[in-house]
């Protein structure tokens, strides 16, 4: 049996955080909560901390700390309240913590995820930006500090499970022997069948209505545009040392097959399961053993059929832009992610039309390509380029 794990759940009030706490609560003999963090929902954070007995909570500023203290209704002593990004990174690296669930959405989660890797933690990676914006830095930190890296995105977790047993290295430097290509599946989101000409009038509520998964608003929009899948292609490149030409995307509307690995002999291994994030979370927490997740049985007779099709890049230009960014290099991936975060925020606030999300990304990628050559050798380099890309996106007049 693996050692008892004390988990820091970064981004605990989101959907991944909820699912993580659900799995942890099912295994009190093996798992406990060391720390929680949240950005805005202090009432929920207080309730979570009281329920799981967290020793530490991390909030963004003093105002949030005051709201947390006012919301505290726990019978036990209030947890230590830490404030700010530096406290978040220090908590992720704390010696009392063995495992970090990196589930903060966006580039804001990057420093803490990197700190966890540098401290040699088991990192359950649900934050895409750690690899999209800083893949080389992050993977080097994993290798150099003996960290364990377990992907939590359902697609990458599926690929991880389908890889050769001896090839599940924490940070490979070359593709696994015998693996021909990776096949990432995508539901196609709510607009899979919609005429591209009609997408101009899409509302935030429509874009957030994912047909299969329960997710936060930002990632739901990313799923609708398939930018989310593009980010996952970039992640797969770093996680499995796989070149872009050996990574393919398939639309699979049922979301039962979570991804596949094709081998040189023609064999294809697929991981199937319910569209429930507790499955990959339990896998990451229990690895190399299996933990009960609370997910029900998969009844394939209920589905009757499983469909697959090629993505329409006219309907999903963000996917094509993501492949282009990966081929262009790490600075382009930083710009891609920054532009998307700015554009999606503007869309959700009603300041940007849905179809202009891709336009903003394309404009920022064109801007980045014209910049002087950039070498990203530190987190500060990444964050500087991220800030400049966000500034350019925000000044386009579209956002």
From Swiss-Prot:
Pfam families noted in UniProt: DXP_redisom_C, DXP_reductoisom, DXPR_C
The Gene Ontology terms for molecular function here are: 1-deoxy-D-xylulose-5-phosphate reductoisomerase activity; manganese ion binding; NADPH binding
> Pathway, according to UniProt?
Isoprenoid biosynthesis; isopentenyl diphosphate biosynthesis via DXP pathway; isopentenyl diphosphate from 1-deoxy-D-xylulose 5-phosphate: step 1/6
Report any one BP term from Gene Ontology: isopentenyl diphosphate biosynthetic process, methylerythritol 4-phosphate pathway involved in terpenoid biosynthetic process
Residues that hold Mn(2+) according to the record:
153, 155, 232
Protein keywords:
Isoprene biosynthesis, Manganese, Metal-binding, NADP, Oxidoreductase
Per its UniProt record, the required cofactor names are: Mg(2+); Mn(2+)
InterPro entries membership = DXP_reductoisomerase (IPR003821), DXP_reductoisomerase_C (IPR013644), DXP_reductoisomerase_N (IPR013512), DXPR_C (IPR026877), DXPR_C_sf (IPR036169), NAD(P)-bd_dom_sf (IPR036291)
The entry's 1-deoxy-D-xylulose 5-phosphate-binding residues are: 128, 154-155, 187, 210, 223, 228-229, 232
Q: Which reaction does it catalyse?
A: 2-C-methyl-D-erythritol 4-phosphate + NADP(+) = 1-deoxy-D-xylulose 5-phosphate + NADPH + H(+)
Keyword check for Repeat, yes or no. Answer: no
| Keyword Oxidoreductase in annotation | yes
Q: Where does NADPH bind?
A: 13-16, 127, 129, 216
E.C. numbers: 1.1.1.267
Write out the similarity annotation: Belongs to the DXR family.
Query: PANTHER family under this entry?
Result: 1-DEOXY-D-XYLULOSE 5-PHOSPHATE REDUCTOISOMERASE (PTHR30525), 1-DEOXY-D-XYLULOSE 5-PHOSPHATE REDUCTOISOMERASE, CHLOROPLASTIC (PTHR30525:SF0)
Function statement: Catalyzes the NADPH-dependent rearrangement and reduction of 1-deoxy-D-xylulose-5-phosphate (DXP) to 2-C-methyl-D-erythritol 4-phosphate (MEP).
Q: Which HAMAP family match?
A: DXP_reductoisom
This chain belongs to the protein called 1-deoxy-D-xylulose 5-phosphate reductoisomerase
